[in-house]
Amino acid sequence: MSAQASAENWALNFNCNMTPTSQNKTWGTLAVKQYTFGSCLDNQKVRYSIVEGAGHTADYGENIDLYSLIWSFFIATDGDRAARNYKILALGDSYTIGESVCDTCRFPEQLKERLISEYADRDEFSLQIIAQTGWNTTDLKNAMTTAEPANNFDLVTLLIGVNNQFQGKPFDVYETEFGELVDSAISLVGDDASKLIVVSIPDYAFTPFGQNFNPTATSAELVLYNDFAREYCEAVGLSYVYITDITQQGLETPSLVASDGLHPSEFAYTKFVERILPLALAKVD
């Protein structure tokens, strides 16, 4: 597809006219062609850009996430470097292991595949998962001690806590052990806290299964867990990705729920990855 055809295809989604005005620019070794469309949705102009350089092409509209935009410019100038093997570690429970979905459907696998698609063919990505259905924070701590993972990962994700809530564990256990898990996770990326992504806890109240367990109380309790994790991350400067609202659409959008009526589906995990990916691209270097 030509650059103009690609731009017009993108603009079509905004009900724009098909007569773009283009402007060619250079940014260092990059060639940037920018298209501007008028008469679009809500009478606003939108822009679409094609970036080319070092054998890599990145195209995006003006609503592109800033992290992705920055990454696009850097990766496009990175064509001569040596091949790399990026290592990803995913820590958690059933939401990380992908209960009731296929192995390639769970969010860590989808994230790995998206990263592979964004990087040069010569690069490799490997994934290790330490997670199991039913694990609470104590279980994950013990499993990490047993597994003795290496400390040279390039990216770590942490999603944990739903079973503390479901099993009725004292909240102060989560408060203590969440911080300990964060510290352990950071140690596995060479003590570089910027390489950690904490993911919020899904809300299972909005599933057929969750409707049987006082869903109003469930949601309220999970708010406490997620608020604590978010505030902890904000206080120490960690990345936190909120995906809970996606799962809160599970009753009105059944395709977000797996066949067991409880866990997220492949489709839901794809939506998780859409939010995680921009941060992952900025962190994996």
Per-region residue spans from a language model:
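Active-site segments of SGNH/GDSL-like serine hydrolases
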Residues: 159-162, 186-222
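Alpha-helical scaffolding within the catalytic cores
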Residues: 28-38, 108, 114, 137-150, ...
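Oxyanion-hole/transition-state-stabilizing segment in secreted/luminal serine hydrolases
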Residues: 52-53, 57, 61, 137-176, ...
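C-terminal catalytic histidine-bearing segment of alpha/beta-hydrolase fold enzymes
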Residues: 8-81, 281-284
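Structural recognition of the beta-strand scaffold that forms the well-ordered cores
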Residues: 9, 47-51, 87-92, 96, ...
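Solvent-exposed loop/turn segments at secondary-structure junctions
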Residues: 53-58, 94-97, 132-137, 161-167, ...
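Catalytic His-Asp segment of secreted/periplasmic serine-dependent ester chemistry enzymes
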Residues: 203-285
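Serine-esterase "nucleophile elbow" of acetyl-processing enzymes
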Residues: 81-131, 145-150
